[in-house]
Amino acid sequence: MASGADSKGDDLSTAILKQKNRPNRLIVDEAINEDNSVVSLSQPKMDELQLFRGDTVLLKGKKRREAVCIVLSDDTCSDEKIRMNRVVRNNLRVRLGDVISIQPCPDVKYGKRIHVLPIDDTVEGITGNLFEVYLKPYFLEAYRPIRKGDIFLVRGGMRAVEFKVVETDPSPYCIVAPDTVIHCEGEPIKREDEEESLNEVGYDDIGGCRKQLAQIKEMVELPLRHPALFKAIGVKPPRGILLYGPPGTGKTLIARAVANETGAFFFLINGPEIMSKLAGESESNLRKAFEEAEKNAPAIIFIDELDAIAPKREKTHGEVERRIVSQLLTLMDGLKQRAHVIVMAATNRPNSIDPALRRFGRFDREVDIGIPDATGRLEILQIHTKNMKLADDVDLEQVANETHGHVGADLAALCSEAALQAIRKKMDLIDLEDETIDAEVMNSLAVTMDDFRWALSQSNPSALRETVVEVPQVTWEDIGGLEDVKRELQELVQYPVEHPDKFLKFGMTPSKGVLFYGPPGCGKTLLAKAIANECQANFISIKGPELLTMWFGESEANVREIFDKARQAAPCVLFFDELDSIAKARGGNIGDGGGAADRVINQILTEMDGMSTKKNVFIIGATNRPDIIDPAILRPGRLDQLIYIPLPDEKSRVAILKANLRKSPVAKDVDLEFLAKMTNGFSGADLTEICQRACKLAIRESIESEIRRERERQTNPSAMEVEEDDPVPEIRRDHFEEAMRFARRSVSDNDIRKYEMFAQTLQQSRGFGSFRFPSGNQGGAGPSQGSGGGTGGSVYTEDNDDDLYG
């Protein structure tokens, strides 16, 4: 099966490569010759394409842009490259390294007349005749080919002026001969208008959704450009495409790019703008939009925020919305078979759209524009930083790996935040009163990796703005002891994120959940925070009681929402603190307002089962009452690993004390080992409290000595001239001794016995400590039919076990 798929993939890729290797597709390189009308190829390539020196060629760039130039040979140019200067590159909307196509264009006629206008900011302050100084010397005896819409740069006098070709006769391209009439009357063209067309979005400006973009191209470009294909095969081309996904992933951007690249007429309908208070006007607005598009075919109608104008009819109370939905349905059915009109729509709430719109023949294709993965994020970052001045230490790959759950809009915000931070650093060198900024300051501006790190600390994914998602600042060093638990946790969360290939190799899906149980104050919450930080996953902390609300059905909706958010921001750790408050055993909650708690548990169970294996969402529960939790949650496949976090032993207590005091100045003679020995039965929280109290006593003493010294200085100023040492430079033994007088255990022996019992019963009910396969049976993977009573059975069946299933 796999080999068939592989060979199919290979055939496809070789076909694509062959297509890419067409001889007339060349890579753009920097020109040596600065002439605006000349491109250079190597002599072998010119021979291959049957071109001669001085031939006119048509170049095709991006966004359906074309240019006509004269071709010359250049010995220094390699065969697969074409040399062109910046003016030609801008006209073709390409950069160095992009691919363009070239073809002979022998039938370019001499122009009768052309109309060119300068760009306003390049002619400011120029007096004199533009034609005499600039245009006449530029075109004289040059026989330059030009195309309508081209911008060209002319150097003359002391300045360089940019001109735009507004009109040519014959259109769209011609050669400017000696008898061509050149008009240059009229208002100069505004730079802003020009910039807008330059900044049109193309496929290059979209990152992170290659697969979806390929799908959309196929569904939009083929019907618009080659409708005959569908006619030949005898099917109807797709009519409508629905783009859905979280906000900020680039749905509107994709629609604009498709329109620019296909050159189709683009009609934008912003959902809410269609609405009108007059009866019947909203529907007529829709009808007008479709009529306009049919007139200007090929056309793309793009409806943004579709859910605003086409909600489910049974759920809306307004008559207007229902009529608009019906009107949209009839319009989409009424589109003529080959009207070359495609309707695209975008929404981030696909489930609130009327189902009649989502059938075949209307919005028959739905494309999920999801949250990008690490490679997608890197593409997006490269697009947003291509015009930014980056320092050498900026590692965009690292930034991409650390921005889990960020969509394109978040990454754009991140880049601008990093740039602002770079400017902030130089603010003291910038005088806001001055009109101009010193050139040295401008040149020294560059965005460094530190600026990106700062921006990262300030930003979190927009999908998770409501549920505060923090990647906690807790590391493994903050947690003393619990080495086995740490390793277990790393295997659970870090392996699936960092080594997904291993799980594929062994053919198993990673486990999804863990339950920590144990006495209070042993670091259950701290562990969950540390694991989220260590593998750079997003972290959503859910306090159990917050989920429950007074409204019927609201609590379950809260659970659904949280799981949806976690899936969007994957990899994500969902941490349920105090799980026993929302997952009590069902049936025992009498009088809790219609069994709300039971329904919440049911919702959590179904959500845990519905976690798709591709999304790295991990659930960690923490409780100190494991005995009252519903057993269905504890089965394998949900919270399948139950980890007992006991009170720390002596070695762990030393580690906890060291972790707590690692940033504090402690006197050399404070024996932490002895302190750990004396605090048997203390939890991590109790030990932290001892450290805090000792620290507080040291601070108190320090403040008192400063006050005393201040008084002495006031009474006897001359005696206090000499600078004294800090009277309390560190936390001393007596501080710890004083703190130990107030120390108390928060967990009684009785409580510990309960936990130990629960852990033991779990171990017995789950583990087969003495299980071994029988040595004689080396056969197949499954047990043989007749081995019921042989040696195989006696390995793990003990004599005193009652066989409840016999």
From Swiss-Prot:
Location of cross-link Glycyl lysine isopeptide (Lys-Gly) (interchain with G-Cter in SUMO2): K8, K18
Residues modified to N6,N6,N6-trimethyllysine: K315
Localization, UniProt: Cytoplasm, Cytosol; Endoplasmic reticulum; Nucleus; Cytoplasm, Stress granule
Phosphotyrosine: residues carrying this PTM: Y805
Gene Ontology MF annotations: ADP binding; ATP binding; ATP hydrolysis activity; BAT3 complex binding; deubiquitinase activator activity; identical protein binding; K48-linked polyubiquitin modification-dependent protein binding; lipid binding
Ranges of Gly residues composition bias in the record: 777-793
Entry GO terms, CC: ATPase complex; azurophil granule lumen; ciliary basal body; cytoplasm; cytoplasmic stress granule; cytosol; Derlin-1 retrotranslocation complex; endoplasmic reticulum
Superkingdom of source: Eukaryota
Residues bearing PTM N6-acetyllysine: K502, K505, K668, K754
Post-translational events: Phosphorylated by tyrosine kinases in response to T-cell antigen receptor activation. Phosphorylated in mitotic cells. ISGylated.
Effect on the protein of changing R313A: Does not affect methylation by VCPKMT
N6-succinyllysine modifications at: K668
EC number(s) per entry: 3.6.4.6
Residues annotated with Phosphothreonine modification: T436
One record GO biological process: cellular response to arsenite ion
Domain comment as written in the entry: The PIM (PUB-interaction motif) motif mediates interaction with the PUB domain of RNF31.
Stated name of the protein: Transitional endoplasmic reticulum ATPase
Species this protein is from: Homo sapiens
